[in-house]
A protein has these predicted regions:
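Cysteine-centric segments in proteins
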Residues: 1-89
Length: 89
């Protein structure tokens, strides 16, 4: 497991009364390359409020370079910001 806490550009869909649903995101790697990752499935969404700051935690997986990758995305409600928080290996 790697904790990244890396900001990502996200394309998401919003429905009335539900948290935003991630569809795909772009991430920039250390070498400067930019990769688009399609969110294949959201397995679970948790609503958490650490220190009074509401956010949603998404447990997802995607097929990346012919491998299944499990990861955790976070959406910070007050900041309207997405983050790739953790990658499970």
């Amino acid at each position: 497991m790697r904790v990244l806490e890396k900001a990502v550009d996200m394309l998401s869909v919003s429905y009335i009364g539900k948290p935003p649903q991630p569809r795909k995101f772009k991430i920039r790697f250390r070498d400067g390359t930019l990769k688009t990752i399609k969110v294949d499935q959201v397995k679970r969404v948790d609503s958490v409020t650490p220190a009074g700051h509401p956010n949603f935690v998404y447990y997802c997986y995607s097929e990346v370079d012919d491998k299944i990758v499990d990861y955790e995305l976070r959406y910070f409600v007050k900041e309207m910001r997405w983050e790739l928080y953790r990658v499970y290996e």
